Amino acid sequence: MQQAVARVFGTTVNVDNQTPDFFVAGDFNGDDSVDLAVLVKPAHRRLSEINSSLANWIIQDPHRAFVPPKNQTVVILPPRTEPEHVRSGQLLLAVIHGFGKERWRDQRARQAYLLSNAAGNALASARPSQSLQRDFGVFSSQRDVIAEQLGGSHGVLYWTGAAYAWHPESSRKRN
């Protein structure tokens, strides 16, 4: 897992393994290849590389992701927002999309995201809940979601087809 993070992000981030559940694997984007999500922090003096417009990853806040209205055939996209920037010491969730038979371990697996305001506790791979499917609509393919505790709330991170988005879930039932 450390090798995959180093392969994709080089020396710009460090794995934060302070909790027992600091990483999780699942097919988060629904392409039948297992992906990896792992807690990381920016490496000392590497913020300019992390935040570079030429970086090989996308920095995103799932709380600000555009989620198209369900069951609507024509959707008007919102105006573009300013790019997200990583701050010193910020805990992030790095997601590496898998590729081929080796999945996230494949040397060619390079599609990656750094998710801000999304690094929680109790990371787990789960199936989309009925609540998420009711709010988002039917997913175009089977996929997993990243279930977690974030700021005292239980919720999931899910792939919309263009970005990762946050969906709060009931704390009583975990799917």
Where are the regions a protein language model picked out?
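Beta-propeller-forming repeat regions
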Residues: 1-30, 34-175
